[in-house]
Amino acid sequence: MKRSTQLGVVVAVLLIGASVWWFSRAQPGSIELLPEGAPTVDSGVASATGSGATRKTTGAVTIDGGLPEARTGGGVELARFGWGSGEGNLGRSRPDEANPEAPMSLTVDALGQVWILDQVNERLVKLDRNGKPLGTVPVPVQAAQDVVVTADGTALVMDRLVDKAIAVIGPDGKQKGELPILGKGLEEGGASTGLFADGKDVYVEREHGDSVKIGSTSGEANRDRPEVPGRPAGDGRTYLTANIVDGPSGVVMVTAIDRQPQQHRFTRQLVVGLPVLGLNALDADRSGVIYLGTIVELPGSTPELPQFGITLLCLDPLDGRPLGQTRLPANTSPEETFRELTVLPEGGVLYLERTEQGPRVVRYACGS
């Protein structure tokens, strides 16, 4: 790549402030941001050659030569907000001497209700499955970055940088407890790259590789802190990891491991067909279909006028073969976020899209 092109891509990456898995420290694991050394925003960047994603994934690698034709458009708006602190608004912060922020994360609970982490306004914003506001819940930690809601309505909110703890909030909105992040398996808060719940167990992903069980949804910490080989997926049956094999060539790889017994199911190498700068989603729906979000540089992009998008891939749960892909617009404003895409239990994703006028929640299907 010519130096002028490299500089152009570096500048462009600065604009993609919403990539879920970016932050300023490159560590071994399973996610890679290209170009190497580019300024980054929030969640963890990791090396594709690190051991975290491959230590327990021994097995054959299947290589795909291409993907189904991309579906474009077709998103259905669920809710729209303005920027601000009042009702119907979500917070945005653009300080002179710190990273700008927008809502860090969103998730969906067992009832289909949407929870948005509006940390600038120190609250969770709750919507029904049709996008109607249901109220807010105070956030009791100082630097919240991720949220997960369990089947019984317990909300888990992660602060990995200041309090370095997971706040456990009951269905009544009152805090039930707090789980420390630091301990066996997690020596630094910044190494935490995702928050996950599996039944009553609470896991924190380390450097996009293994996940550490830090406690339970009752607020009780786990002293032993055992590890599992990847992030617990939403199907209840799979651990997942992903990595970028060759960013400029658009080659990525996904590994699935069965939970019981803990054995390798597949490793699938996929050719996206466009340069890949980062990954911003990895999960499975209730049926087991796996979703991988890739941030790509679009055809016609130049150093002077870079153009980016998100290619959302859906993969077969048994062997990882591509079932379809959908092209989404990339968020290019400078705000930091942590999880801008969340997989719906019934299939498809919700995307927290940002504009200068305000953010909106959009539902997308994957493929045709």
Regions found by a protein language model. Give the residues of each.
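Eukaryotic scaffold repeat domains enriched in small/polar residues
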Residues: 4-368
